[in-house]
């Protein structure tokens, strides 16, 4: 929805005398001309929905069975700008975008499909390959070189080296004794691999692997009752979805992660209550935070994506009609 503000030129009269004195007449004439120009151009226009500069980025989410959706940012409607069709009728479980705008889409059953940029209107996968021997693709992340990291909801993380083809197989399988159930995955500016891990049903923690990802990772303390899912990084902050029905939140950590790291603060406004469960998170180039839900908060809210503006202390905007539990933002 757009807000339109129109400036209308007018001349104020007081006791039948113009308030523009002769000494200020040139300035008044200039101001009147400027205001008239604004009115002729329709005044100022701004989007009521937070987002990056128009035309610079897109939001990618899971869609109908066998599809992922692309939305232009800022979000101004519920109609996708493009549909990405998988080669099989499988539900989308993960999405990621590389630095050039190529999109990776993971699906239940263990397949990963790559859609080459630019994506407009509708797109078909250029290549599809398996996530190793796993039947799950929980989350995906690209590094700056275009290599793809895929979690398996188990004690392994598969790495696929660029360029990706239909014959791609894991070039590396990352594992360690303290990786139990890897779910979310993210890479910081130093290419440290951060994994959201669930060592037991009693809670979750974070593991940090330094390149080349063969050593024992840094492990944070387990957060009781937490169920960590998708993650996203903006500058020196790591955003981690803590998914619990009726009590979801986003835990925010300061980078770099150490063994002593704990959430610096949390975001729960708009994520708490009803049957809602948070799952997805992404950030745009303006550091606006997008949170994806499953379930709903009541009869008037069916779980539209939430958009938070830094410093993330206020109520979110709700992207009505745009739903997704796994998210990515990119070109």
Regions found by a protein language model. Give the residues of each.
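Flexible "stalk/tail and boundary" regions
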Residues: 46-331
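Bacterial Sec-dependent N-terminal signal peptides
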Residues: 2-17, 23-25, 29-61, 65
